[in-house]
């Protein structure tokens, strides 16, 4: 029974406090009551925390969009995360494209120029897909998780303490209002005691809130380190992708634009060579780029002269008829041009064997 009486008294006291705060808040909004202002330093800290929260949320959400553009996939990952379960593993976009290219290449025939190139491109796309997964995983751990921890942890604590500070201020100002209205000496003495108590509680809560808010500077320093980790992860990812594409370009070789045209029709537009960014120089130092213009020039000179050149075979090639020469990848043969020959072919010699060979399967040597 005593416990029930205590609970009823506490409930009545809480209701009275809530009503007092509501009245004080309303009168402040109507300009009918004075309001205790926070000191300028605390106001600046509150503003800094709010600004940090807003921009952290925006950066976090946009980073998630960057790493996973598919909104349905993001929603699925969110639900699995809330259920504390691992999302099912699926191919990402580069891996899926790579698989399609490999399947198409095998369907068209690995021995054909197009089929072989599709397979090699598909393998590279799969490598890029793996690098993409590593970027997402590293970025999630080193960048997104710390940002999310701030939003869902530190800032929630700040919000809770800030709300408590607001309530303590309302209690203080309500007590000050009652003191002003007190006429009887006994009531005035009680109101003065209430003001002293609420002032002490307000000052204590203001100090707690201030200490929490001053931690925002440490949060910025921590997020700066996380940002550096994110930049490093991106740099590694783009360097890997560049290296993979440079490897692919080297495997495919750089040939006249007839290789890129349909129905073996010649095109006069030169293929642009890839320029190596200085930031990736270290990643690609061991992979020299083959200049398209040099190769094009070399073949043009060979066709216009009666001389011959050594050439490295890029892929296996099975001769379609007796006028062609079968080739093995990485072997070196002698090539030359004869009058009236199709622009996509050269004559090749290997010992006593000779026959037509497709330009797209060759890399001219100096």
Curated annotation (Swiss-Prot):
Its main location: cytoplasm. Residues 306-366 form the SH3 domain. Residues 1-37 are annotated as: Required for membrane binding. An N-terminal amphipathic helix, the BAR domain and a second amphipathic helix inserted into helix 1 of the BAR domain (N-BAR domain) induce membrane curvature and bind curved membranes. Keywords: Apoptosis, Coiled coil, Cytoplasm, Golgi apparatus, Lipid-binding, Membrane, Mitochondrion, Mitochondrion outer membrane, SH3 domain. One of its GO terms (biological process) is apoptotic process. SMART domains: BAR, SH3. Residues 1-30 are annotated as: Membrane-binding amphipathic helix. It is a peripheral membrane protein. Pfam families: BAR, SH3_9. It comes from the Eukaryota. GO terms for molecular function: lipid binding. PANTHER family: ENDOPHILIN-B1, SH3 DOMAIN-CONTAINING. This is Endophilin-B1. Residues 34-54, 160-185 form a coiled coil. It is found in: Cytoplasm; Golgi apparatus membrane; Mitochondrion outer membrane. It comes from Gallus gallus (Chicken).
């Amino acid at each position: 029974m005593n416990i029930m009486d205590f609970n009823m008294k506490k409930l009545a006291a809480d209701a009275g406090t809530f009503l007092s705060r509501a009245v004080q808040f309303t009168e402040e909004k109507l300009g009918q009551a004075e309001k205790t202002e926070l000191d300028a330093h605390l106001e600046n800290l509150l503003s800094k925390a709010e600004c940090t929260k807003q921009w952290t949320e925006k950066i976090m959400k946009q980073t998630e969009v960057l790493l996973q553009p598919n909104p349905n996939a993001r929603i699925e990952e969110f639900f699995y995360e809330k259920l504390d379960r691992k999302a099912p593993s699926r191919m990402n976009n580069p891996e899926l494209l790579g698989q399609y290219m490999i399947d198409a290449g095998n369907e068209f025939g690995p021995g054909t120029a197009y089929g072989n190139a599709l397979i090699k491109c598909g393998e590279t796309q799969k490598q890029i897909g793996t690098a993409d997964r590593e970027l997402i995983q590293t970025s999630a751990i080193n960048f997104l998780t710390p940002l999310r921890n701030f939003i869902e942890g530190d800032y929630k604590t700040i919000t809770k303490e800030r709300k408590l500070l607001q309530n303590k201020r309302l209690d203080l100002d309500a007590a000050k209002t009652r003191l002003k209205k007190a006429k009887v000496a006994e009531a005035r003495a009680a109101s003065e005691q209430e003001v002293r108590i609420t002032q002490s509680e307000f000052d204590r809560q203001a100090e707690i809130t201030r200490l929490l808010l001053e931690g925002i500077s440490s949060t910025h320093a921590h997020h700066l380190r996380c940002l550096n980790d994110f930049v490093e992860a991106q740099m590694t990812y783009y360097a890997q992708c560049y290296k993979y594409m440079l490897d692919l370009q080297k495997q495919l070789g750089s040939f006249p634009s007839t290789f890129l045209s349909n129905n073996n029709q010649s095109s006069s537009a030169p293929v642009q060579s890839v320029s190596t960014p200085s930031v990736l120089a270290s990643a690609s130092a061991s992979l020299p780029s083959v200049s398209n213009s040099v190769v094009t020039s070399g073949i043009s000179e060979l066709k216009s002269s009666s001389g011959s050149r050594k050439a490295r075979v890029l892929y296996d090639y099975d001769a379609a008829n007796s006028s062609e020469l079968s080739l093995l990848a990485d072997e070196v043969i002698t090539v030359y041009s004869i009058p009236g020959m199709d622009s996509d072919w050269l004559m090749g010699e290997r010992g006593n064997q000779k026959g037509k060979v497709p330009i797209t399967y060759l890399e001219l040597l100096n």
